[in-house]
Amino acid sequence: MITLFPSLIIQQQVNSLSTRHLVPRGEGEFDFVWTHFGFADDTPEMAQRRLRQANLFGPAGFVSADDGEVIEFSQDGFRQAKSGSTLCELGGTGTGGAEHMVTETLIRSMYAYWRKVMGV
């Protein structure tokens, strides 16, 4: 699983490639869009297999929690007044390097870039 941007995740699980894309629809509202890929020459059996594998994840998935619901809960928890902002310090505040692998500097860097791109 690779998060390319806060709103775009690409995942390859078993024999399936999927994207998850968050599409903002307004304040406090978004669509959570899944796209599953296959090949034009897949047999009907392979297409069915890919669909079954795709269903391992998501709202009715057997493997992971529904990220859409988790994201919604997170947004509710971080909601502020229009002029407010939220800072979640999970082991620091910076975006510099660390001498260990257990760090959240990469995710903080991604969101710092997102804020720059979005102008917030």
At which residue positions do the language-model features occur?
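C-terminal catalytic domain of Rieske-type non-heme iron oxygenases
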Residues: 1-120
